[in-house]
């Protein structure tokens, strides 16, 4: 079980933004093939009225650097119009994740599915041979995963776990193909009450850390939990 510890990050002033020609959020940063790759969400001016004052995200770019100063935009790596299960008027490709396993790169992303009676968010997977793509999306989202903000932890024994937010925080094992659940989702216990999102899990020195934004007394802070 995770025991919750909380930390509040003080106010910081952003300096030297690495992306200046487009609106981005929710970055996940990974070292692949000797370079740093940053996978953010991408906000655009809304083409539809209902999203004029909300997030409007239709695709993903990836950026890479070998010195953390000079960055290359590899362009669009995935667009909602190329994902078979995503609603064409969704514009909800929010916080993504990318991991490497079995010689492939797996890109996890949330969006809203098309189809009568479909509600809420699902999480899909796209696969590539290189960290900058091209990524090929699966025809359907991961069955049993309903939420946003995917995070995938590959443990030291090779077992992969997927975490996500939506009606609390959940986790499940992934099959070796990285495309299907190998266990039933469970709710992560021991976390503080209140709205939580954006989970990120990692291991260091034999301890597992689970970080997440948390709304505490109407202010969003960064919190973390630890487990064995």
Where are these regions (language model features)?
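Bacterial Sec-dependent N-terminal signal peptides
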Residues: 1-15
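Carbohydrate-active catalytic/glycan-binding domains of CAZyme proteins
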Residues: 14-228
